[in-house]
A protein has these predicted regions:
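C-terminal beta-signal and adjacent terminal beta-strands/loops
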Residues: 22, 688-706, 737-805
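A beta-strand signature from Gram-negative outer-membrane beta-barrel systems
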Residues: 92-138, 147
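Transmembrane beta-barrel wall of Gram-negative outer-membrane proteins
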Residues: 141-170, 175-214, 246-263, 501
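Surface-exposed extracellular loop regions of Gram-negative outer-membrane beta-barrel proteins
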Residues: 217, 416-417, 421-426, 469-480, ...
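Outer-membrane beta-barrel signature, preferentially recognizing the C-terminal barrel domain
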Residues: 230-253, 257, 435, 439, ...
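Gram-negative outer-membrane beta-barrel transporters
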Residues: 571-573, 592-699, 800-804
């Protein structure tokens, strides 16, 4: 009774602590107590590990050890690795909640079943946690100050069980000005084992979040201000820090599953679920006024050819006067006050309303003792409504909803209306303006697999065939694209994706296992890449087509009571990919819709990971990765004028042999842990990453830009060369102390990342698509603008205390 009362109190405290704030989910899995990782010293250790240990040891070790750099494993972005609950796709932001609810996760790093970067599957049919509870308080200072969380599992009568989780985080970052987080996350899981043997599971989860984020900038700005953690997105308002870039979310999620044994040989898993809510991103907008961003290239010394002016600007930056190096909110209010009620500056809130639902029916039939079939159907609909809202008028009365980029245009200055059906509408706080549209995706797929499994062999063949339909629905009628060109339903793009994969595994003994997986798939591009400008144009790209992916993966696994070892070799090829970008073209001085087609990449390499239990007290983990991640052809760059879809140019981009950004070509980590069962544990680890590159820009390598605008071989090389980032290494340490009090445990953990406090590690970067233009006498000179980079955090400390009972 006392434990239950304490849990209720802690849940209420964590809710009240954050009831007035909304924040983004933050995954603290990397800071789990060392005490929770102590080995099970029994004869069942080997059996337990074979059945229940995650299949991806390399991913388990590297997922958080390399948080100090961009780490797109195998050269694929994180969003290409989906999260599913009983075949229903959910956002990976829910991972923390799902693990705390006791769901069994199976991490698959290979491209089986069409998931090109692997997947994480959560299963509700693998049992429920025993009755227990845990509450924690934690402090970090990295991104936010600290928080509280509580989790409880309880077995009820008549086959019911319930798990609940709630966590709150809040406060300002101790390292980066302007960074903050206020969030609360909650989840509940209900499970019911029926007398017939059927299983019912319902999972509900949500995160309410608001995060003040940092932004990368050029090395020039970092050097001038003398701080690699400089953040240009905030400024002082009435003596308080205010960030112009905030990210918010409120996206509740629900998944319901029903498992039934239809016959002696056939079982059914039926699932339905979805996510409904919204995400927001704020930014400053300016309308017939100068940019408010302090790190804009026109406000830095390097922009000026007059050395006297450049020196004056440099001195202002080196003094770190926040009126110049940060957003000057007071100046924005002053300019608005002199505009007669019309906003020259406003805080915009870009909003996406998510409405996505899925349904899945999966069958498994045992044809014989060693042969089984899996087959099923999956249907999904995703209707994402996207619009812009006036967040704050900064002292102005209203904002006239017109296209301010066209005010001085010789051709279109009389066609300014963003919403022709409500011309010259005066938008006030909370009103939609600029654009309003919905992208609707409908998917239907059938799949089947056959598995042959004996004591040593496991062979599977899988195939899926689907239908993918996408259309745009415009809710504003743009004046430059009147009637059906922007308003109402566009044409529907129909594609037919498919996947073919096969895998084979052989077990030599309970310790040794090898496997080989190959997959070929054609997949639909992201919906936003199928339109020239989905914000206000119903025009689709020319010849929309499927992307092709081919993957092969060979792996070896060794498992015993003393060690777990995995080694794998992989190859992943992508062809016929498409990317669409809306940007300003400096050569034509025109806003353009830029379509990059026929993108091809190749990733191949090896991964090695091991966990060796040297004794009952000592344990080591090791990971090594080496690979090559490159673009393999020169894609086509097509520029359309954003005002009337006129073709401006088409040329090839010199991308062949460029490296994929965000992934180290060589990486390694090693950690040693000491565990004393009297209540102490400590660990020390080192992480190294080398051969890293900034993400290359397609447009600046186009023949039109790199060859035609370059006045010398030196400038041409500047356009097509790719910056290699410096090698990075960190030393991490942690210390834990726990106390067993009856049937409960109190634990304390102190973790330190980047123990040596290195402040010059570049987290990652990307090339700017913009071009710098200046004159040298009568000659026009074009050069690429500086790369945008972000630096890693210095020494960071995480402390947590938890009570499990």
């Amino acid at each position: 009774m006392r434990r239950g009362l304490f849990l209720v109190i802690m849940l209420c405290i964590s809710w009240a602590a954050m009831a007035q704030h909304r924040g983004e989910e933050y995954d603290n899995r990397q800071y789990s107590d060392i005490a929770e990782q102590e080995p099970i010293l029994s004869d069942t250790l080997l059996f337990y590990r074979i059945l229940h240990r995650p299949t991806d040891l390399y991913g388990e070790i590297t997922a958080f050890n390399f948080s100090f750099i961009e780490f797109a494993r195998r050269g694929t972005p994180h969003y290409a690795h989906p999260t599913l609950i009983d075949n229903i796709t959910v956002r990976s932001a829910n991972n923390t909640i799902l693990r705390n609810l006791g769901l069994t996760d199976i991490v698959q790093p290979t491209a089986e079943h069409g998931y090109i970067a692997g997947s994480t599957h959560y299963l509700t049919t693998e049992g429920v946690p025993l009755s227990s509870a845990r509450t924690s308080l934690f402090f970090t200072g990295k991104g936010y100050l600290g928080g509280i969380r509580a989790t409880a599992h309880h077995l009820l009568r008549r086959g019911w069980s319930i798990s609940a989780h709630i966590a709150a985080r809040g406060g300002n970052s101790l390292y980066v000005d302007g960074e903050s987080l206020n969030s609360i996350e909650a989840g509940i899981r209900l499970s019911h084992d029926l007398r017939s043997g059927d299983k019912l599971s319902i999972i509900l989860a949500t995160t309410l979040a608001r995060r003040g984020i940092r932004s990368g900038t050029t090395r020039e700005a970092f050097t001038l201000i003398g701080d690699n953690l400089y953040n240009p997105t905030w400024g002082y308002q009435a003596g308080e820090r205010r960030n112009a870039r905030e990210r918010g979310e409120c996206v509740p999620m629900m998944v319901a599953s029903y498992h039934r044994q239809l016959s002696e040989r056939t079982e059914l898993l039926a699932s339905i679920g979805g996510e409904w809510g919204k995400t927001t991103n704020t930014s400053l907008g300016w309308y017939g006024a100068a940019t408010p961003h302090p790190d804009n290239y026109r406000l830095l010394p390097s922009y000026y050819t007059d050395l006297t002016v450049a020196h004056t600007v440099e001195e202002v930056w080196r003094r770190a006067d926040s009126r110049y190096t940060q957003i000057d909110w007071a100046e924005l209010y002053t300019i608005n006050a002199m505009a007669g009620g019309e906003a020259r500056y406003a805080l915009e809130r870009r909003t996406s309303r998510i409405a996505r639902g899925e349904i899945s029916a999966s069958f498994r039939t045992a044809i014989a003792n060693d042969i089984s079939l899996r087959y099923g159907v999956r249907a999904a609909i995703n209707a994402s409504r996207n619009y812009k809202v006036v967040g704050d008028l900064l002292g102005a009365d209203h904002l006239t909803d017109i296209d301010y980029y066209l005010v001085d245009d010789d051709t279109y200055s009389l066609n300014l209306q963003n919403d022709l059906r409500h011309p010259n509408r005066r938008a006030t706080k909370g009103d939609r303006f600029g654009y309003d549209y919905t992208l609707v995706e409908r998917e239907l797929s059938l799949y089947a697999s056959a598995t042959y499994q004996t004591e040593r062999w496991s062979i599977e063949a899988y195939a899926s065939l689907g239908s993918h339909a996408t259309h745009r629905n415009g809710h504003f009628e743009k004046e430059i694209y009147p009637a059906e060109h922007s308003y109402g339903k566009s044409r529907t793009i129909r594609l037919s994706p498919y996947t073919l994969s096969t895998s084979a595994g052989y077990t030599f003994s309970p310790q040794h296992h090898i496997s080989l997986t190959a997959s070929l798939s054609r997949q639909a591009p992201y919906a936003s890449s199928l339109w020239l400008n989905p914000q206000y144009n119903n025009r689709t790209i020319d010849n929309p087509s499927l992307e092709q992916h081919f993957t092969i993966d060979a792996s070896y696994k060794y498992r015993s009571a003393k060690a777990d070892i995995t080694a794998s070799a992989f190859l992943h090829s992508t062809t016929s990919a498409t990317n669409t970008l809306r940007a300003y073209d400096d050569l034509s001085a025109t806003f353009c819709d830029i379509v990059t087609s026929d993108i091809a990449t190749l990733s191949y390499g090896v991964e090695f990971a091991s966990e060796v239990r040297l004794s009952s007290h000592w344990r080591t983990t090791l990971s090594l990765g080496a690979g090559n991640y490159i673009y393999t052809n020169n894609p086509t760059i097509t520029l359309f004028a954003d005002t009337d879809n006129t073709l401006i140019s088409q040329s090839r981009s010199e991308m062949q042999s460029c490296h994929i950004g965000g992934v180290p070509h060589i990486s390694g980590s090693a950690e040693i842990t000491y565990l004393d069962y009297s209540g102490w544990a400590c660990s020390l680890g080192v992480n190294v990453a080398a051969l890293r590159y900034v993400e290359p820009a397609f447009t600046r390598r186009s023949e039109r830009v790199a060859r035609q605008s370059a006045t010398s071989e030196e400038i041409f090389r500047e356009f097509i060369s790719q910056e290699q980032l410096g090698d990075a290494a960190t030393l991490d340490a942690s210390l834990s102390r726990w106390f067993n009090i009856g049937q409960s445990r109190l634990s304390l953990t102190l973790s330190v990342k980047n123990l040596l406090g290195k402040r010059d590690i570049v987290y990652g970067g990307y090339e700017s698509a913009r071009i710098r233009h200046y004159r040298s006498g009568a000659q026009h000179i074009y050069r690429p603008q500086d790369n945008i980079v972000t630096y890693a955090y210095p020494r960071t400390i995480y402390f947590t205390t938890s009570w499990r009972f």
